[in-house]
A protein has these predicted regions:
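Alpha-helical elements of Rossmann-like donor-binding domains used by nucleotide-donor carbohydrate transfer enzymes
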Residues: 14-18, 96, 100, 132
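Conserved acetyl-CoA-binding loop-helix of GNAT-fold acetyltransferases
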Residues: 84, 90-106
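A short, internal acetyl-CoA/4′-phosphopantetheine-binding micro-motif in the GNAT/acyltransferase core
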Residues: 79-89, 118-120
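Short amphipathic alpha-helix that is part of the acyltransferase structural core
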Residues: 1-34, 42-50, 55, 145-152, ...
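Acyl-donor-binding surface of acyltransferase catalytic domains
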Residues: 99-170
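A conserved beta-turn-beta hairpin within the catalytic core of GNAT-like acetyltransferases
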Residues: 65-79, 89, 108-111
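Conserved beta-strand in the GNAT
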Residues: 48, 54-65, 78, 83
Length: 172
């Protein structure tokens, strides 16, 4: 098994593909979403784990490095996404990826590391459907702070549009 920097990994599409193989039915990551979210990663905190040329895990770390300063954000690092394929779990790979990411974030100077809820995030934290993973993070020093919820509005409500607001033009 080899760990390499994410920016040096040439098959980036396999990152969201292995995620989607397990979680795509509830938390799909499209190519567009993935590419948008890795634009602002912290390279020194983002890695992939490869075994015989096959991607088996990854971690994506972020720090605030936008030109617009937000008070307190310079003290925060984020673990945007972390994953190890089922076959390779319970072998210390996730722990190694997490540790490498955390060490890079600490070296950068952050004093708080959040799981998720980064800007341009995939998740606002640990998804409720993945609650079985929570003890793994707690064992590594992460604390449950609060729960967030997705809110849904149904769009099947009838909307009335009056013709006097629009001018209809025919193709003739």
């Amino acid at each position: 098994m080899q760990v390499i920097n994410l920016k040096k990994y040439e098959k980036l599409e396999t990152i969201y593909q292995i995620w989607n193989a397990e979680y795509g039915n509830i938390y799909p990551i499209s190519a567009e979403l993935f590419n948008r979210n890795i634009e602002n990663i912290y390279e020194k905190a983002s890695y992939v784990a490869v075994d015989d040329g096959k991607l088996i895990g990854f971690v994506i770390g972020k720090v605030w490095h936008d030109v617009y300063k937000i008070k307190g954000y310079d003290e925060i690092g984020w673990i945007s996404l972390i994953y190890v394929t089922p076959k390779y779990r319970k072998q210390g790979i996730g722990t190694k990826l997490l540790s490498m990411c955390e060490n890079a974030l600490i070296e950068y100077g952050v004093s708080i590391i959040n799981l998720g809820k980064d800007y341009n995030n995939y998740f606002p934290g640990l998804p409720i459907d993945l609650v079985k993973i929570q003890p793994w993070f707690q064992k590594r020093g992460y604390e449950f702070t609060y729960q967030t919820h997705d809110l849904i509005s149904r769009t099947n409500k009838k909307i009335s549009i009056k013709n006097n607001y629009f001018k209809f033009i025919s193709a003739d």
